[in-house]
């Protein structure tokens, strides 16, 4: 069987979480779950999930990812990942866990798009290495790069490094709290849409992407998301599961951890298919909605009626959402 052309690859850590709740049995071996470091551990799974939702077989095989697993990584989990029918490369370490995979000599090197969760310093280093490897492999075309800043570096002292790194990526996507923290604003200010717009514009004005043609996408919790670029005024999209009039969380929201990662995976697929940032954010919103309906990953069932995730069709949900926002 020939190797498929890869459209999307997410680069990040792969860790099984153990989640402990007061007065409850712990949840063990949660694939891409929450937990103390869940935002980092789940990133590659959630982003890949978001992309996979909108890449049905055989297009699912254009979704490429590599995971390094330790000797104790459950085979059941590996089988579940393989059931997604993607291009999954599993490197098992017999004596120690390893959390990063190398792109050398793999089909992932020719991907059309990459998602990174990195510090600004590592972002520039890894992107430079990626482009060098691609050039050596005869892949001179520049891929589409989405950068999600590592949350723990979103502090005022890292603002300038983040702005510098943003000049080398196509999409910069912090969440609202991370964006506010970068500029030294309080968490309360992060919930104000005007503040988020103003900060996103400041980032954009400093230069995002080659020739300043990049996009800032802020994932803003209960406010949804906002897309800002040089050619696009701030465009807000509501969350798929809005809070009630009393401010209470929607009943379908079980665990929001990782929804932002899934948003970005789906965003990339949407952008590759439509070349439109707002349309891509619709994909992202719907992709994120599947990630927050449970702890861990949604259930995939394939049958005569196609693929259902948690009993729902991703494309039907996308059509429903586009009607809501008037697209």
Where are these regions (language model features)?
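Conserved phosphate-binding/catalytic loop of the ribokinase/pfkB sugar-kinase fold
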Residues: 83, 91-125
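Substrate-binding N-lobe of the ribokinase-like
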Residues: 4-12, 16-95
